[in-house]
């Protein structure tokens, strides 16, 4: 791996610092850039909402703040992954690229996989497993065994601080503040309450769930009236990757040793396979 290359860490559904393999491995040489690709067409697609966009805003603000503690920051590229690849090539730079697998399977197959397949012809590309995703395993009989094995692996180390985060002007990105102004806050909010995003919010939900809210989870998770209080409320955080599924799994195993809600937590453990 050439020493003059810049490591580029691509964020999509892994908006966290802790137990983020792409971020850790991309930070080892301490010469890296962290980029979130904001694709307007993706956010205009079916299943996307203004609520999700504001949840993303929280996640990105917190991620940027945490990256600044590492002498780095979150840069924003506006466009799809094909346009991002063209920008890479046009910059004439030398890069190593780091990705995590995405749980957004359709988008991953159509956009991110295309970028990876093109980029490996020109750059060093590193793709890491995330959340138990098994994209090449067609034998589903072994799926749960492999999932358990991945969850029981050690979490990766925290990322290294950045020593060189100079911005290549040929490679066009914008600041997070500008993204929020032109692409997020420009949408009118037609709601009052929204679930806060970010790793800190995810950690608080996890702790209150283990401490008290999980009581009668196995019964009340299907109740429209009670589920809001007795479910983990972590699905959005798993979807955006603000908290590592492996971290939750390991913390759950420790909690099961002493919890007075063991039967409820065992039900939760089964549903972790589906990120609920």
Where are these regions (language model features)?
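Trp/Phe/Arg-rich N-terminal binding region typifying the photolyase-homology
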Residues: 1-161
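Glycine/tryptophan-enriched, flexible segments
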Residues: 123, 142-276
């Amino acid at each position: 791996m050439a020493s003059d290359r810049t490591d580029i860490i691509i964020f999509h559904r892994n908006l966290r610092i802790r137990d983020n393999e792409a971020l850790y491995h991309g930070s080892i040489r301490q010469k890296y850039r962290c980029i979130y690709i904001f694709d307007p067409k993706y956010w205009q697609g079916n299943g996307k909402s203004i609520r999700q966009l504001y949840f993303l805003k929280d996640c990105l603000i917190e991620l940027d703040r945490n990256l600044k503690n590492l002498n780095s920051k979150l840069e924003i590229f506006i466009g799809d992954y094909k346009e991002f690849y063209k920008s890479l090539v046009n910059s004439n730079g030398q890069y190593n690229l780091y990705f995590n697998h995405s749980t957004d399977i359709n988008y991953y197959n159509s956009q991110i996989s295309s970028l990876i397949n093109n980029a490996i012809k020109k750059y060093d590309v590193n793709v890491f497993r995330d959340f138990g995703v098994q994209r090449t395993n067609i034998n589903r009989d072994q799926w749960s065994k492999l999932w358990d094995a991945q969850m029981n692996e050690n979490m990766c180390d925290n990322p290294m601080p950045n020593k060189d985060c100079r911005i290549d002007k040929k490679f066009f990105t914008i600041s997070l503040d500008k993204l929020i102004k032109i692409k997020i806050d420009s949408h009118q909010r037609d709601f009052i309450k929204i679930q806060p995003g970010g790793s800190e919010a995810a950690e608080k939900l996890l702790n209150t769930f283990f401490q008290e809210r999980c009581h009668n989870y196995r019964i009340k998770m299907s109740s429209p009236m009670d589920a809001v209080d007795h479910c983990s409320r972590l699905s959005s955080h798993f979807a955006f990757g603000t908290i590592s599924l492996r971290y939750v799994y390991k913390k759950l195993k420790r909690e099961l040793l002493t919890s007075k809600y063991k039967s409820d937590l065992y039900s939760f453990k089964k549903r972790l396979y589906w990120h609920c």
